[in-house]
A protein has these predicted regions:
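Arg/Lys-rich, low-complexity, intrinsically disordered basic segments
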Residues: 1-112
């Protein structure tokens, strides 16, 4: 199972020759991944973990963006997760993907 966005072995690196460097999620890598998700949302497709092309929907983009917060908390701790949550919140707001439920979910990640 390949990483979709991060690392030299990621799906993006293999197929697009672009990837987010490093391992683990911090604010810098989250910003890079959000920009790749944005590109996928515009073109209408993405990769799954087997590097096959699949449809990119707003719902999938939202799930992937929110998951960055959980990964940041796991890899770097609560303080970095809060910074990533702010980025994700702004990104979701910019793309009109922010709802009350999503706000609560982001708040739960940051406070838990």
């Amino acid at each position: 199972m390949a990483n979709i966005y991060q690392g030299e072995g990621s799906c993006w690196a293999q197929n697009e020759k672009i990837y987010v460097p490093g391992s683990g999620i911090d604010a810098r890598s989250a910003r890079g991944i959000l920009s790749l998700i944005e590109r996928e949302l515009k073109r209408g497709w993405t990769y799954d973990h087997s590097c096959r092309k699949i449809r990119m929907t707003p719902a999938l983009a939202k799930r992937r963006a929110i998951y960055l917060i959980a990964l940041a908390k796991k890899h770097r701790g609560a303080a970095e997760a809060r910074r990533v949550a702010e980025l994700v919140y702004s990104w979701l707001e910019k793309h009109r993907l922010l709802s009350g439920a999503v706000k609560r979910k982001i708040a739960a990640y940051v406070t838990a």
